[in-house]
Curated annotation (Swiss-Prot):
Biological role stated in the UniProt entry: Catalyzes the condensation of carbamoyl phosphate and aspartate to form carbamoyl aspartate and inorganic phosphate, the committed step in the de novo pyrimidine nucleotide biosynthesis pathway.
Catalytic activity: carbamoyl phosphate + L-aspartate = N-carbamoyl-L-aspartate + phosphate + H(+)
Species for this entry: Acidovorax ebreus (strain TPSY) (Diaphorobacter sp. (strain TPSY))
Protein name, UniProt field: Aspartate carbamoyltransferase catalytic subunit
A GO molecular function held by the record: amino acid binding
Keywords (A to Z) from UniProt: Pyrimidine biosynthesis, Transferase
Binding site for carbamoyl phosphate: 68-69, 118, 148, 151, 277-278
Keyword Signal listed: no
Pathway(s): Pyrimidine metabolism; UMP biosynthesis via de novo pathway; (S)-dihydroorotate from bicarbonate: step 2/3
């Protein structure tokens, strides 16, 4: 019944779209991470290409700004030997009033095989996935506050790389959880993979009321929230999504919730520090932590290419 209800899976329980980590069986999440391991080695070769998507067309549709996600998706598709097309939204017919689905129909008529979609509206990738032909696949690159599944997966890959086993891990997600699609994806992924304890840490105004229902512990004090943690994931303040004065100032936020070397000492000595980017130094995290030995922020970016290669190669191999 799970497979029939989940629009990401076909009738055989195979992944045909990646829309959200929520509802994905553990074996599929693990399969993506295992497949990504094979692609990490590709990036270490002199010729960083494999022919798995040769002849396939990947369309990147980013209706919101992006650096890391858009670029790593483009690199990932090219390393799979796909033909990659980046739609310039500002100059496209969408800017002239064309509907999202009409845009999709026109690009589908150009023989698109995979759509990578980032959109400000939650649910937009789901709408596209329900609309496209059975042989076309949709990968969610972030939709509103809802989900950012490939970021969640690359975060899990990074954690697994450094910590091996999730079952004994305590993970703290610190910052603007309210507006963060990454936080929700990470929580679902950590829960699916059996993390011992997941915490969210932030001001009361930036922590959603449903966090406890998601099986996480909520802290409104940074020192208490990261004490004894194995992994600390910091999130930026998403001022572009804030409609009111949820915080007094960035300086006040840093004073209470900014991750400094002194505060990081409350976590375990071998704790790793992660950040999905973009980083706002001196707001959610101190430069000394970003550039310090416990930060694995740049490896996250590197692993992100392999994870996105894994996702596209897996969905492209399955039919609806």
């Amino acid at each position: 019944m799970l497979y029939k209800r989940n629009p990401q899976l076909n009738k055989n329980g195979e992944l045909i779209h990646l829309l959200s980590i929520e509802g994905l069986p553990k074996d599929i999440v693990t399969h993506i991470l295992d497949t990504a391991t094979n692609f990490v080695s590709v990036q270490e070769r002199e010729v960083k290409k494999v022919p798995l998507l040769r002849g396939k067309s990947v369309f990147n549709l980013f209706f919101e700004n992006s650096t890391r996600t858009r670029t790593t998706f483009e690199i990932a598709a090219k390393r799979l030997s796909a033909d990659v097309f980046n739609l310039d939204i500002a100059r496209s017919s969408t800017a002239k009033g064309e509907t999202l689905l009409d845009t999709i129909d026109n690009l589908s008529a150009m023989a698109a095989d995979i759509f990578v979609v980032r959109h400000s509206e939650s649910g937009a990738p789901y709408l596209i996935a329900q609309h496209v032909a059975p042989h076309v696949h949709v990968v969610n690159a972030g939709d509103g506050r809802h989900s950012h599944p490939t970021q969640g997966l690359l975060d899990m890959y990074t954690i697994r790389h450094y910590k091996k086993d999730f079952s004994n891990l305590t993970v703290a997600i610190v910052g603007d959880v309210l507006h963060s699609r990454v936080a929700r994806s990470d929580i679902h992924a950590l829960t699916t993979l059996g993390a011992a304890e997941v915490r969210v840490v932030g001001p009361r105004t930036l922590v959603p009321s449903d966090m406890a229902q998601m099986g996480v512990r909520v802290f409104h004090n940074l020192e208490e929230g990261i004490k004894g943690c194995d992994v600390v994931i910091t999130l930026r303040l998403q001022n572009e999504r804030m409609s009111g004065a949820l915080l007094p100032s960035s300086q006040e936020y840093f004073k209470s919730f900014g991750l400094t070397p002194e505060k990081l000492r409350l976590a375990k000595p071998d704790a790793i520090v992660m950040h999905p980017g973009p980083i706002n130094r001196g707001v959610e995290i101190d430069s000394a932590v970003v550039d310090g030995p416990q930060a694995v922020i740049l490896p996250q970016v590197t692993f992100g290419i392999a994870v996105r290669m894994a996702v596209m190669s897996i969905v492209a191999g399955n039919e609806a």
